[in-house]
Amino acid sequence: MQKGLELAEKLECWFMEYFPTSQRKDIAQSMIFELQDKLVEKEYLSSKLYYDLGSYSGNASYSSTRNNYLAAIVTAQNVLKEYPYTKMREELSILILRAKYHMAKESVLEKREDRMRETVDEYYAFKNEFPESKYMKEVEVIYADVSKYISTDEE
């Protein structure tokens, strides 16, 4: 399905490029935006699935418990890079924060503090971009928990 949506988007962009004065320009533009929204939603659902799988490793005997969280982070970040003005930016951003938080909590001791710091960075990025977010209470709870793991002494 994604290949079909991407092909349709390319065809509509081609139409806009070769027929910029067409009477159907506005229709083509709105169709492009609609297709982009569908692609973003599909990728969001993929990212959310990875997040929901969390530390589940299935039948894999080699699997790291954090692969699903990492996949959720990478998928959501790629969507934000490709479609920076998406309507789902807040949902993708909170998903990244949640996944980084859970990945950090489940990390081995050697990596935990660094990953907690990455989570704090993501917290500040989220808070700056969405100061009035409906997720702000959850974000503050994550920050409070993460702060416990980060050493503050500069020795």
Question: Would you name each region that the model predicts?
Answer:
Residues M1-E155:
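Acidic, polar-rich low-complexity tracts and alpha-helical solenoid repeat scaffolds
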